[in-house]
């Protein structure tokens, strides 16, 4: 912690944002101790201290939002990438995902400490039907319950809007996700995009 805080002070920044991801439940208690210690060091040096977190789920409870809310100045909820690059389903971050993340966080952290991180990017998803062979290979796995193979690439806001125009598609409001949505067929599959505008 000393080196991180010293570097922040030397650089003249306002604070430190801690963003450790994919921490195992086994390491949770040690991570929370790091958060406590780094918080003390930041406050001793007049630095603001914030911690990034996934949307609260049972599998990441070891991040201990309640304790973070006590020791950190801000608890940031990364309310984006509901479905990530490797997901079986497409869609970036629906309004229900954002709302759920905020509501769960507010049960453990004071509202004046919560920051909801929202995306300034989206993903262009490409879906193709899986072959019978692929489905057979996936039998008995979660992947087998999805008939399409999905891939995606991240796009900035302007690039995302331009991809819809370039495809000759029209985005329409999707009431469920509360986002503009477009899809089109090309390259032997279906492109889908949810626009964060």
Residue ranges and their predicted role:
Residues 122-197:
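Glycan-binding loop/region signatures in secreted carbohydrate-active enzymes
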Residues 85-104, 184-196:
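Gly/Pro-rich active-site loop or hairpin
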Residues 76-77, 83, 100-129:
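Active-site region of glycoside hydrolase catalytic domains
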Residues 45-46, 107-112, 146-148:
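Structural alpha-beta junctions
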Residues 64, 94, 110, 155-156, ...:
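Helix N-cap and loop-to-helix transition residues
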Residues 1-95:
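Chitinase-like catalytic core of GlcNAc-active glycosidases
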